[in-house]
Design a protein with these regions (language model features):
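Beta-rich carbohydrate-recognition modules and glycan-binding surfaces
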Residues: 23-261
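Bacterial N-terminal signal peptides
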Residues: 8-16
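Sec/Tat signal peptide C-region and signal peptidase I cleavage site
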Residues: 17-23
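Intrinsically disordered, low-complexity segments enriched in polar/charged small residues
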Residues: 7-8, 95
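Positively charged n-region of N-terminal signal peptides that target proteins for export
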Residues: 1-4
């Protein structure tokens, strides 16, 4: 009898301790978002619709030694796709594309170019959702000793350079870049930026490498993120509006704390 009572009591205590643990929501929701597959369909892609981003295009800027008289730099979309992505392409009727860039410089040295998103004729920074842990993309290397970096802007407004490796290989390669934990991705201030943003790609030449004929192609830029990292109980109240206090105070002829700048 006593053993039965002890057993029932133990089960009751176990249930009491486990119930709150089971009921607590997870603080992690790891997802992967494809930012751009460079298929250039002329309409908003899935990420632009999901994140509320603008329908950006891509542009390029270069260092001063670029061969402008030769019409460089050149950028366009081309039919193509890495073999590893072809198996994942469920729409067999589609025509996957990649973004290509061709450069030629007048002399060796510390030459560079940047491929960046653009909207309405101005540079546009793509917002990340959640807290990104890694960014990866496919790049076609021409076996030149060039170096490629990712540029991101943190929630404090500082631009960080994330090295992705060199381009001394032939064909397609998937490059994966870990986002350092010290980069602030969310501002603690209500008036501060709510997310980290993607600024663009930067490619740098080795000072001793040939620079007269270089091609590079990009495909499927994506990132892995914890979408719940900045979500907390009462999150919906963070950006609530209290109304236009300044207009109310001016109409009544009295001042208030809401007028303080």
């Amino acid at each position: 009898m006593k053993k039965g009572v002890v057993l029932l009591t133990s089960l009751a205590l176990l249930a009491a301790f486990c119930a709150p643990v089971v009921a607590q929501p997870s603080s992690r929701a790891v997802e992967t978002f494809i930012v751009d597959d460079f298929d250039n369909k002329g309409e908003k892609n899935a990420y632009q619709q999901m994140s509320g981003s603008e329908q950006w295009t891509w542009n390029i800027q270069t260092s001063r030694n670029i061969n402008k008289d030769g019409g460089f730099p050149k950028m366009d979309y081309f039919d193509g796709q890495p073999n590893s992505l072809k198996a994942l392409n469920k729409d067999k009727e589609s025509s996957p594309k990649v973004l290509g860039v061709k450069t030629s410089y007048l002399r060796k040295g510390e030459n560079w170019f940047e491929v960046y998103p653009e909207f309405d004729g101005k540079a546009y920074e793509i917002p990340f959702v959640g807290t990104a842990t890694q960014i990866d993309f496919w790049v076609w290397g021409a076996n030149y000793l060039y170096y490629i970096d990712l540029l991101v802007r943190d929630a404090d407004g500082r631009v960080h350079t994330l090295p992705a490796g060199n381009l001394a290989f032939n064909g397609w390669r998937n490059l994966v870049v870990t986002v350092p934990g010290h980069i602030r991705q969310h501002s603690r201030l209500r008036s501060g930026p709510t997310e980290m943003t993607f600024v663009g790609f930067r490619v740098r030449t080795d000072p001793d490498e040939y620079v007269d004929d270089f091609n590079i192609f990009f495909d499927q830029l994506k990132y892995t993120t914890n979408t719940l990292s900045n979500i907390f109980d009462g999150y919906e109240l963070k950006d609530i509006e209290f109304g236009d206090s300044s207009s109310k105070s001016s109409s009544s002829g009295s001042s208030s704390a809401g007028d303080a700048k």
